[in-house]
Every structure is written in C-alpha cells, then in structure tokens.
C-alpha cells in the first residue's frame, strides 16, 4: 500500500508516512499558521496530486502558496468557494474550479468527484506519472469556516462522504479546525471521522505540534517550523 511521506522524521521513520486512506485533523488555535503546516503536508511529491477545498482564500492565492514551496502547479487542483461570490462569471478551468459559496456543499461534492475522476482518467495534467491508483493529497481549509455556514449534523454527513471517498481512492485527507471556537461536542464529532489528530499550539511565539492516533509515533509535543513547504522539527 502507498505511503504518503510527511517530511517529519518522527512519522516517516516510524511508519513510512501516512497510510493510504488516512484522514487527519489539524486542530489548531487562531494565528498559528496551521494552513502553512497543512499545505506542507499535502504538497504533492513526484507522481502525486494535491486538491485543496478553499473556503478562506481565492484559488490564485492557494496556487501562489504552493508555488513558494516549489510544488509543480500542474498537479494541484483547487475548489474555490470564495471567488464566485464577487466574480459570478468566473469560469472553471481544468485545475481551478469554483462554487458559489461555502454553503454549497452539494456543489463542492460534485466538483470534488469530478476532479478525482479527471485525475483517475489521466486527463488532469500533462506529464502524468502513471501510478495507479493515483496518489492524491486533499486538504479542507477550513472545516471551521464550513461550520459557520452549516449545522454540525449536516457538515458531519458531508465530511463523512469526503473521508469515505478519500479512503476508497487510497488518498490522504487533511482537515483544519480551530481548536478554540467550538464546543467539545463539535470537536468530538469531527474527530470521530478521523484516523489521527495533529494538535498545534503556540507558546512564547514558538510553534509546537503533537501527533495522536498513529501507532508507534510518540504523542509528545515537538517544536517545529515550516519553510518552503518543509516541516522541520526543532531539537
């Protein structure tokens, strides 16, 4: 089975990376740059693809963020839930697609399925690697924004479909959630859909993460930084 490298030795050296079909919740407070961590974890390596569902940034901003990491934009797709509200006539391209708003979960689901199908058919980009099933990294940035627009029970069902889809196609999913804005019931329900949780905290301007739910990987807090799409654990 395919393993998705993370660039974090504490994970890769123990289990080779995230197993295919794994869904990971990044639980982080505001202003902790969790999106930068998430993008580093879904940066597509050679032969891989990345898809971002963006409810916070325009597609162009997401592509720029990945460009700074050195990722090949030919293998990055964005489902943009922001731009169409201000530019209703904007048209989909092969790799950048648009929905009316973060409330349009049906539209998001359709665009996601269509993009997956395009990748599987080898029509997403030139220079296809030929791996099958094609390794796909997926990110929802962010679950917090979706929860502002839809009831928890509705969003739970939506995420249940997404996580099941990622498992079926042997991809890997990263989902960002603000750890300070929601009650324990909400956090608990979202966690039920995940295989593991990466918690992030900031203390005295130093970033820490810990991994929970991956067998053999320590759950101790680790100092870290992210630069150019690479996560570095600081001794």
What are these regions, as identified by a protein language model?
Residues 21-22, 47-49, 74, 169-171, ...:
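Short glycine-/polar-rich loops that comprise or flank the Walker A/P-loop
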Residues 25, 51, 137-140, 174:
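Structural motif
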Residues 56-59, 63-106:
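Nucleotide-state-sensitive switch-loop elements of NTP-binding domains
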Residues 31-33, 58, 85, 144-152, ...:
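Short acidic, S/G/P-rich loop/turn micro-motifs used as interaction or catalytic elements
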